From Swiss-Prot:
<dbReference type="GO" id="GO:0003866">
    <property type="term" value="F:3-phosphoshikimate 1-carboxyvinyltransferase activity"/>
</dbReference>
<feature type="binding site">
    <location>
        <position position="169"/>
    </location>
    <ligand>
        <name>3-phosphoshikimate</name>
    </ligand>
</feature>
<feature type="binding site">
    <location>
        <position position="171"/>
    </location>
    <ligand>
        <name>3-phosphoshikimate</name>
    </ligand>
</feature>
<comment type="similarity">
    <text>Belongs to the EPSP synthase family.</text>
</comment>
<dbReference type="InterPro" id="IPR001986">
    <property type="entry name" value="Enolpyruvate_Tfrase_dom"/>
</dbReference>
<dbReference type="InterPro" id="IPR006264">
    <property type="entry name" value="EPSP_synthase"/>
</dbReference>
<dbReference type="GO" id="GO:0005737">
    <property type="term" value="C:cytoplasm"/>
</dbReference>
<keyword id="KW-0057">Aromatic amino acid biosynthesis</keyword>
<comment type="subunit">
    <text>Monomer.</text>
</comment>
<comment type="pathway">
    <text>Metabolic intermediate biosynthesis; chorismate biosynthesis; chorismate from D-erythrose 4-phosphate and phosphoenolpyruvate: step 6/7.</text>
</comment>
<feature type="binding site">
    <location>
        <position position="197"/>
    </location>
    <ligand>
        <name>3-phosphoshikimate</name>
    </ligand>
</feature>
<dbReference type="InterPro" id="IPR023193">
    <property type="entry name" value="EPSP_synthase_CS"/>
</dbReference>
<dbReference type="InterPro" id="IPR013792">
    <property type="entry name" value="RNA3'P_cycl/enolpyr_Trfase_a/b"/>
</dbReference>
<dbReference type="InterPro" id="IPR036968">
    <property type="entry name" value="Enolpyruvate_Tfrase_sf"/>
</dbReference>
<keyword id="KW-0963">Cytoplasm</keyword>
<feature type="binding site">
    <location>
        <position position="22"/>
    </location>
    <ligand>
        <name>phosphoenolpyruvate</name>
    </ligand>
</feature>
<keyword id="KW-0808">Transferase</keyword>
């Protein structure tokens, strides 16, 4: 297996121009494909997950052109639901941001489409979404294991009253919200359980509004969506920088700054993960906000005990930053780490122990006590981009770290390690 050894880093300082947000990129691509008119997306993320969405749209007959660097995309909207001319199988890798929204959108009208993916995708639950779509009339068949992909979709979603469990993944609700306006009837979506990752729902609602569709949000407990609507192209749309990707550079600055400035997000960003900067500030770093940047300057870091449900992806970065904080850090209400690219609670606990931390792994929490001195380790990444990027922070100690399968960052940030090296000074 390929590996990358990072030598100790004495200091980080500089500016990072963030790649486009994965969450925003894939939502915007699908809405542009469903919309009337031509949409030009700029600062689109070029990564594996986005390529899976683009390939799926092409197979569904959507016409688009990409710039040479794949960050500008002109899409000719379909002006309504997407249909395959004949039976079709779409391979979506391990891209939840493609699998979940497409599973819903392709239930409009009549289709015969199979959605499948990598082995890990077949372990990521989708039953709550399927149950909700079936309540709205969709015909969906599990081809292997009940409640998991691959799925056969044969259309039929017309709207009506649907319940969806919000406690596992906000992507199920996102998928329903994006699909419901194009259904022939009105849809009332009721949330069962506690809704996780609410800020990701705000991204969805924000984008739907940009594409001309309004819905009624009743305190995140019920959503009322008028049927028979259509999406309209906003013309040109700039994809925000990826706030989850910003977390590694901001944390690096908190540990070994200097000052690091990330551009492409700022105080008015729609992504909930910008709140990661508030957590660093609470730990002792100095944060400065602009309209299109966030900067972080080193501070004496202290442990925290916090509910991290609102920033599940960026919270992983706090788990490795905790290695450099004084005291025991506890991250709570993070059960949904277990159904991501890997079981992130298990993976994080396992790899933190390798570098010498004392770790308690609970059902939905993790408690981390840093060692006096970090140990050299080979870090398994579990084909999870965030594990690779999180553990790069270990090099901010006086210990090297080896990251196995470093190219797994291609899911969201193909040149992450080059960007980190650019702002790093060797010890």
């Amino acid at each position: 297996m390929e590996s990358l050894t990072l030598q100790p880093i004495a200091r980080v300082d500089g500016t990072i121009n963030l790649p486009g947000s994965k969450s925003v990129s894939n939502r915007a691509l699908l809405l542009a494909a469903l919309a009337h008119g031509k949409t030009v997306l700029t600062n689109l993320l070029d990564s594996d997950d986005v390529r899976y969405m683009l390939n799926a749209l092409k197979a569904l007959g959507v016409s688009y052109t990409l710039s040479a660097d794949r960050t500008r995309c002109e899409i000719i909207g379909n002006g309504g639901p997407l249909h395959a001319k004949s039976a079709l199988e779409l391979f979506l890798g391990n891209a939840g941001t493609a699998m979940r929204p497409l599973a819903a959108a392709l239930c409009l009208g009549s289709n015969d489409i199979v959605l499948t993916g990598e082995p890990r995708m077949k372990e990521r639950p989708i039953g709550h979404l399927v149950d909700a779509l079936r309540l709205g009339g969709a015909k969906i068949t599990y081809l292997e294991q009940e409640n998991y992909p691959p799925l056969r979709l044969q259309g039929g979603f017309t709207g009506g009253n649907v319940d969806v469990d919000g406690s596992v993944s906000s992507q199920f609700l996102t998928a329903l919200l994006m699909t419901a306006p194009l259904a022939p009837e009105d849809t009332v979506i009721r949330i069962k359980g506690d809704l996780v990752s609410k800020p990701y729902i705000d991204i969805t609602l924000n984008l739907m509004k940009t594409f001309g569709v309004e819905i009624e949000n009743q305190h995140y407990q019920q959503f009322v969506v008028k049927g028979g609507q259509s999406y309209q192209s906003p013309g040109t749309y700039l994809v925000e920088g990826d706030a989850s990707s910003a977390s590694y550079f901001l944390a690096a600055a908190a540990i070994k700054g200097g000052t690091v400035k990330v551009t492409g997000i700022g105080r008015n960003s729609m992504q909930g993960d910008i709140r990661f900067a508030d957590v660093l500030e609470k730990m002792g770093a100095t944060i400065c906000w602009g309209d299109d940047y966030i900067s972080c300057t080193r501070g004496e870091l202290n442990a925290i005990d916090m509910d991290m449900n609102h920033i599940p992806d960026a919270a992983m970065t706090i788990a490795t930053a905790a290695l450099f904080a004084k005291g025991n850090t506890t991250l709570r209400n993070i059960y949904n780490w277990r159904v991501k690219e890997t079981d992130r609670l298990f993976a994080m606990a396992t790899e933190l122990r390798k570098v010498g931390a004392e770790v308690e792994e609970g059902h939905d929490f993790i408690r981390i006590t840093p060692p006096e001195k970090l140990k050299f380790a080979e870090i398994a990444t579990y084909n999870d981009h965030r594990m690779a990027m999180c553990f790069s922070l270990v090099a901010l100690s006086d210990t090297a770290v080896t990251i196995l399968d470093p190219k797994c960052t291609a899911k969201t940030f193909p040149d992450y390690f080059e960007q980190l090296a650019r702002i790093s000074q060797a010890a």
